[in-house]
Amino acid sequence: MGKMNVRKGDKVVVITGKDAGKRGKIIEAIPDKNKVIVEGVNVVKRHSRPTRKLPQGGIQEKEAPIDSSNVMLLCARCHKPTRVGRRILDDGTKVRVCKKCGEALQ
């Protein structure tokens, strides 16, 4: 399992699967399983019984995890899906960089 190049809060585009082409923000990253949850992507319906917390019960929609290899980071400067590089600055801090335009990603 490789290192995940995306983290919570990143804007990504889905590159494969039924939701290919959709864009969204990462709600949660799960590094142990190499998966991410992206808002509005891979929405599934869950049937729940009535409980004290939810007396109505019924069907709820929520986002399910997708593999992190199925998303690409969107560069804020060039607005294109890009691979992620790493660079060490003069002061010793490591930053992620856009492979297309070379801009540092926050």
Swiss-Prot record:
CDD domains: KOW_RPL26. One of its GO terms (molecular function) is rRNA binding. Gene3D superfamilies: 2.30.30.30. Keywords: Ribonucleoprotein, Ribosomal protein, RNA-binding, rRNA-binding. Belongs to the universal ribosomal protein uL24 family. Part of the 50S ribosomal subunit. This is Large ribosomal subunit protein uL24. It comes from Desulforudis audaxviator (strain MP104C). The lineage of its organism: Bacteria, Bacillati, Bacillota, Clostridia, Thermoanaerobacterales.
